[in-house]
Amino acid sequence: MGYLDEVWWSRLAQPKMHAWSFQGPLRLRQKKKQKGEKQALACYGVLFDEGTSKQMLLRFVERRPISAVTIAFLEWVLAGLAAEGKRVWVLVWDNASWHISKKVRRWIRAHNRRVKREGGVRILECRLPVQSPWLNPIEPTWLHGKRAIVEPSRKLTAQEVMERVCAHYGCALWEPIPQDVL
C-alpha cells in the first residue's frame, strides 16, 4: 500500500516550532530574494507501509505539480515496484486537481488495461474523502521533515533543501521531474 501526496518545501518560511532561549526573543531579518531563485520546491512522495517497515520515495519537480508530472511520477514508481516483483499497487491519495484530472484518470485506465494484457503492476486507486488530508498517513511525515531540515541561521539553497529532505527520509536524490514530460 502506498500513500501518495505532494508537498512544497519552502526555502524562506520556517515551520512552526517551539524552542527555549536564554536570551530575548529573536528578531527576524528581511532577506532580499535573488532573481531567478525558487522560493519553494514541489515534491511528490509515496509512503509505502508494509506493516513493520515504512519506506519513502521522493521526487522533486522542476516547477509545480500538474497532470503530466503526476503521470511521470506514477510511471517512475511503477517501474520500481515492477523491479521488486509487485503485482498490485494500492494507491491512496487525495482529490488534488492533478490527481482527478481526465488526463490522469485516462492514463490509469489505459495502464491497467495494458497490464491486464501484458503483465506488470496494476494500480488499485483509493481516493480519500474531500478535504480530509489527515486521513493520509504521509501528511504528518511532511511536517516532521520540515522541522528536521530547518536552518534558522541562513537561507538554504534549493540543492541543500533537496539533499536534506532526502537524507531525512533515507531515500536517494533523483533528478527533478521536468515540467514538459509528455
Please place each PLM-identified region on the residue numbering.
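Generic structural signal for small/hydrophobic residues in well-ordered secondary structure
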Residues: 5, 43-47, 94, 136, ...
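A short alpha/beta connector and helix-capping loop motif
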Residues: 14-28, 104-117, 128, 148
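RNase H-like polynucleotidyl transferase catalytic core
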Residues: 26-34, 111-140, 153-154
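A structural signal for isolated positions on well-ordered beta-strands in alpha/beta enzyme cores
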Residues: 42-44, 90-92, 124-126
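Acidic/histidine-rich, metal-coordinating catalytic segments
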Residues: 86-100, 128-131, 136
